[in-house]
Every structure is written in structure tokens, then in C-alpha cells.
């Protein structure tokens, strides 16, 4: 670069150019137009040569600066000059220094971008702070909710403990009063006949006083017993509600219905053992003895069974009835819908799905009642030697069944229900799909029905037939029903009965002409292919036309 600059200085082109300009200025008026043009062109050529040399020096200097040096200088000096020169040349105007350069434009755009960027950053910071505040608020609300829940749990536990403590105190007072009453009414063992004769007159007024005191004490004892029964009923109901809530929370974590039913049965037995301390210890010992083997015989625990108190079955029946009603309601609202979802994967028709679930529920109740009868017969045979001539034999049998509900073989009942459904002519079902899909639902219904037979009086479902007159006291109409139709087209869910009283309404679909449609559907239906549980090769006509001993509620249902 230094050599090129030295050559440019040595040629003295700029000095000669200055001389030519001065000569041209002196002779401009005397020269012709051609001569002035020649002078101008010579100067332009000379300036172009000098510019070429200067651009060469500029290129060399820029190369010596590397990739990044000199970039800002070129942008700030060369590019604006070129822009102004080309603009002036295109417009035919001289170069004006007041025209904004590219550098100014770049600076303005850079400032605008920085302002926009700062504005966006501030907006993002504000949004981030708002989100953080909301998150902190949610965390505070969550902490407060947890504290409130913990306080509620503590209060409920304290109230339960206080109730149990009060019950224990009442029991102690009752025992003391009974002991005093027995000691007062106990006859003296060694009394001479002389003292009896001499003290008769003294004993008569004392006996009258004692009778009055005994009556007052008896009234107090009756009051204490009433209070005790009331507290036991309240504790039983609270324990049942607690077990129901625990069962719902465990089902929301998606366990199987079988495990839910077992957990509920254990929770009922625990609440029952709290309300009855004497028999509770025996029931826990029986459950520990039988937990090792589900198929153990009832005779293994005959020696541990004791006669229950008169109020025991009544008190426990209140809690168990509330829990079973809640389980039956949950089966309708949750387990039934889950079973419908499973069947709708294979069946498109909603009517067929609802018929299948209703028939499964009816068959499950029938099989569970039969299993309860057989189980009760076995318990009677096992307990007969130890309760010969006892008046509390039936209470002892029922108490043993209540304490050992886990001995019920629900899987065998599920297999029986599936066999009965396979030969039911009302179900038109694809042969490639099996009713084993409903095993969990059927098992839950069987466990509920079996436990309902231990109540006094037992609970059962109402008899329902297609084409019957719709009873508003037993059923509610489904959403897709014809609300003016008087006949039932088909049943969705059975009604729950206690003797002749309706406890829970069922659900039915009503349509006009339901009776004739149901008759046609029965005549057109083909027989079902049997479940893999019962192979075809072993099932003959005797299995299909088998007879059962129907319950009074199911005596009108046809059997095929």
C-alpha cells in the first residue's frame, strides 16, 4: 500500500490538475465550446485515474485490516457518499451534504429496534411477574386448603375419640349399676330361721324402700341404655360414612372393584368391632384365622363364637345398611358406566348394552342369594354342636356370616352368572365377544347382594319384565324414553326393595308398543354361544334347560 501511495505522490497528478484548472479558468471565455469540453474531459480522465489509484489503495488498506477492521468506516463514509453521488448523478444535481446518509438511516432503524426490543422485554417481565404472583397465590391457597383439611380431620378424629370415651364411661357406669343391683338382690346364704322371724317386720319397710330404689335405678339404667344405643347408632353411621368415603377415594385411584368391595367389607367389620367390643375381639380372631385360607370351613372357628347381645344385630345393621346402599348407588353411577364403556367397544347398539348389564345385575342377585343360602346351611351344620338347645342360634349363625364375609367365593358366583347369561335368549350378542369383560362388575354386584342378605330384613331387587306397566314409584324414566308411554320397553337398572317398600328407584325405558316389540325380539333371538368357562362339548340340553329354585321375587322370570 505504501508503494502505491508513493507512486501517486511522485506523479504529481493533483498538482498538474490544479495548473490545468487555473489555465482553463483564464482561457475559458476565449476558448470555443469544443476546447472547453476537451479541457473538462481531460480533467475527468485525470480525476478518474487518480480515483482508480485511490480505490486501489483503499482496497489494499481494507485487506490489510482483515475481515472486521474498517467495516464501520466504509459504512459510515464510503456508502453514504456513493449513495449521495449516485442520487445526485441520476437527478442531475450537485452533491449536497445535507442529504441524510445511510449511516443515519441505519442508526435510526437501530434505535427503533432497540426501543421495540426494550418495550417487549418490559412487557415480558410484567407478564412473568404476574404469573409468579398468580403461582404464589395458588400455592398459598393450596397450603390453606391443606391446613383446613388437616384441621377437619383432627376435629373428626377428636370427636370420634370423645364419643368412644363417653361410650366407655357409660359402659363402666352400667356395669357398676348392674353389679350393685345384683349384689342387692342376691339372697343371703347363712341366715338362721330365728333372725328371719325376728327381722321380718324390719325387712318389710326396708324391702319397700329397696323396691323403690331398685325401680329408680332400673329407670336410670334404661336411660343409660337408651343413651348408649343412640351413641352406638351415631358411631355406626359415622363409621359407615367414613368407610364409604374411603372406598370412593380408593376407587378414584383406579383399583379393581373386587379390591374395593373387600376394603369396604373390612371397614364395615372394623366399624362394627368398635361399636361392639365383646364380639369384635372374636371377629378379629376369626378373620385372622381365616385370612390364610379363603376356602376354610366354618367349623374351624366354632369354639370362638359367642352369643351376641340383643341389640348387636340391630346396631350393626344400621351401619351396614347405609354402607350397602352407598355401594349399590356407586355401582349404578360408576361401575355400570364403566361396564357400558367396555361393551360399547364391541357393540354399537346402546339398547343391547343396557339389556346385558341389567340381566347381569339380576342374575348376580339371584346367584348371590343362592350362595348365601348354601353358606348359611353350612354354618348351621358347623355351629349346631356348640349351640344345642340355645335360643340365640340363628343370631349366632348370622353374626358368624357377617364377621366372615370374606369367605364368600365370589369368583364361583361370577362363573355361574356368566353361564346363565350365555343361555339367556334376550341377549343378541356377537359370538366373538365374551361376557368375561363384565367379570369385575358382576363380582361387585354379587358381593353387594350377598352382604344385603345379612340385613334384617334383607334387601333385594324388584322383579321386572318387559312390557309391564310402568310404575312411577319403582322406576324413573330414561332420558330417551317416551314419557307418555304406559309400558316398559326394557329395564336399565333394577329397583331396590325392603320387603314391599322401595328404597332406591331403578331406571327403565318406556316406549309405545313395548310389549309387542319385546315379544318379537324374544322370538327372533338366537341362542348364545357358551362362555369358555363352560365348554361346548360338556354342555348339553340338560344345562340349557336346567331348573333353579327361584326366589319369590324372581319366580315370574322365564328360565331357558
UniProtKB/Swiss-Prot annotation:
Alphabetic keyword roster: Coiled coil, Cytoplasm, Lipid-binding, Membrane, Mitochondrion, Mitochondrion outer membrane, Phosphoprotein
Region (Interaction with YWHAG/14-3-3 protein gamma): 1-294
A Pfam family of this chain: MIEAP
Coiled coil: 118-186, 223-248
GO biological process: mitochondrial protein catabolic process; mitophagy by internal vacuole formation
GO cellular component: cytoplasm; cytosol; intracellular membrane-bounded organelle; mitochondrial matrix; mitochondrial outer membrane; mitochondrion
Compartments, record wording: Cytoplasm, Cytosol; Mitochondrion outer membrane; Mitochondrion matrix
Bias (Low complexity): 248-262
Phosphoserine, modified sites: 13, 85, 156, 159, 307, 309, 531
Sequence ranges of Polar residues compositional bias: 300-310
Basic residues composition bias: residue spans: 263-293
Protein purpose: Key regulator of mitochondrial quality that mediates the repairing or degradation of unhealthy mitochondria in response to mitochondrial damage. Mediator of mitochondrial protein catabolic process (also named MALM) by mediating the degradation of damaged proteins inside mitochondria by promoting the accumulation in the mitochondrial matrix of hydrolases that are characteristic of the lysosomal lumen.
Subunit text: Interacts (via coiled-coil domains) with BNIP3L (via BH3 domain). Interacts (via coiled-coil domains) with BNIP3 (via BH3 domain). Interacts with YWHAG/14-3-3 protein gamma; a protein that also plays a role in MALM.
Protein known as: Mitochondria-eating protein
Record gene name: SPATA18
Amino acid at each position: 500500500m505504501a508503494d502505491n501511495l508513493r507512486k501517486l505522490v511522485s506523479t504529481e497528478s493533483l498538482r498538474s490538475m490544479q495548473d490545468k484548472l487555473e489555465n482553463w479558468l483564464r482561457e475559458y471565455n476565449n476558448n470555443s465550446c469544443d476546447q472547453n469540453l476537451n479541457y473538462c474531459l481531460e480533467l475527468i480522465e485525470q480525476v478518474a485515474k487518480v480515483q482508480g489509484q485511490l480505490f486501489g489503495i483503499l482496497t489494499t488498506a481494507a485487506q490489510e485490516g482483515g475481515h472486521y477492521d474498517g467495516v464501520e468506516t466504509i459504512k459510515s463514509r464510503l456508502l453514504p457518499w456513493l449513495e449521495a453521488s449516485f442520487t445526485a448523478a441520476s437527478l442531475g444535481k450537485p452533491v449536497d451534504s445535507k442529504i441524510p446518509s445511510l449511516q443515519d438511516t441505519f442508526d435510526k432503524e437501530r434505535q427503533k429496534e432497540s426501543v421495540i426490543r426494550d418495550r417487549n422485554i418490559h412487557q415480558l417481565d410484567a407478564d412473568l411477574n404476574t404469573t409468579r404472583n398468580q403461582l404464589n397465590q395458588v400455592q398459598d391457597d393450596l397450603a390453606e386448603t391443606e391446613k383446613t383439611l388437616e384441621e377437619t380431620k383432627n376435629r373428626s378424629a377428636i370427636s370420634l375419640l370423645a364419643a368412644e370415651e363417653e361410650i366407655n364411661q357409660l359402659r363402666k357406669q352400667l356395669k357398676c349399676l348392674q353389679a350393685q343391683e345384683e349384689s342387692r338382690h342376691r339372697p343371703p346364704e347363712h341366715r338362721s330361721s330365728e333372725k328371719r322371724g325376728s327381722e321380718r317386720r324390719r325387712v318389710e319397710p326396708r324391702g319397700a324402700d329397696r323396691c323403690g330404689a331398685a325401680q329408680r335405678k332400673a329407670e336410670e339404667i334404661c336411660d343409660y341404655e337408651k343413651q348408649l344405643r343412640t351413641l352406638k347408632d351415631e358411631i355406626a353411621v359415622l363409621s359407615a360414612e367414613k368407610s364409604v368415603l374411603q372406598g370412593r377415594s380408593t376407587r378414584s385411584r383406579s383399583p379393581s372393584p373386587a379390591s374395593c368391595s373387600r376394603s369396604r367389607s373390612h371397614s364395615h367389620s372394623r366399624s362394627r368391632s368398635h361399636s361392639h367390643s365383646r364380639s369384635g375381639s372374636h371377629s378379629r380372631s376369626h378373620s385372622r384365622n381365616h385370612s390364610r385360607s379363603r376356602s376354610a370351613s366354618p367349623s374351624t372357628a366354632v369354639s370362638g363364637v359367642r352369643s351376641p347381645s340383643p341389640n348387636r344385630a340391630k346396631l350393626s345393621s344400621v351401619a351396614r345398611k347405609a354402607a350397602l346402599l352407598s355401594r349399590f348407588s356407586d355401582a349404578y353411577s360408576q361401575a355400570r358406566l364403566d361396564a357400558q364403556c367396555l361393551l360399547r367397544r364391541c357393540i354399537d347398539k346402546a339398547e343391547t348394552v343396557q339389556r346385558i348389564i341389567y340381566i347381569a345385575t339380576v342374575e348376580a342377585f339371584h346367584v348371590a342369594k343362592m350362595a348365601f343360602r348354601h353358606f348359611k346351611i353350612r354354618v348351621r351344620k358347623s355351629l349346631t354342636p356348640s349351640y344345642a338347645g340355645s335360643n340365640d342360634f340363628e343370631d349366632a349363625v348370622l353374626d358368624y356370616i357377617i364377621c366372615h364375609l370374606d369367605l364368600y367365593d365370589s369368583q364361583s358366583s361370577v362363573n355361574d352368572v356368566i353361564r346363565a347369561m350365555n343361555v339367556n335368549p334376550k341377549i343378541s350378542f356377537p359370538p366373538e365377544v365374551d361376557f368375561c369383560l363384565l367379570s369385575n362388575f358382576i363380582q361387585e354386584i354379587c358381593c353387594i347382594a350377598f352382604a344385603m342378605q345379612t340385613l334384617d330384613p334383607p334387601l333385594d331387587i324388584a322383579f321386572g319384565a318387559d312390557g309391564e306397566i310402568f310404575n312411577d314409584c319403582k322406576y324413573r324414566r330414561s332420558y330417551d324414553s317416551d314419557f307418555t308411554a304406559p309400558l316398559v320397553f326394557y329395564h336399565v337398572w333394577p329397583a331396590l326393595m325392603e320387603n314391599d317398600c322401595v328404597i332406591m328407584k331403578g331406571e327403565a325405558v318406556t316406549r309405545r308398543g313395548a310389549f309387542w316389540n319385546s315379544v318379537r325380539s324374544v322370538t327372533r333371538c338366537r341362542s348364545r354361544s357358551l362362555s369358555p368357562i363352560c365348554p361346548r362339548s360338556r354342555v348339553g340340553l340338560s344345562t340349557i334347560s336346567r331348573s333353579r329354585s327361584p326366589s319369590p321375587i324372581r319366580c315370574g322370570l322365564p328360565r331357558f
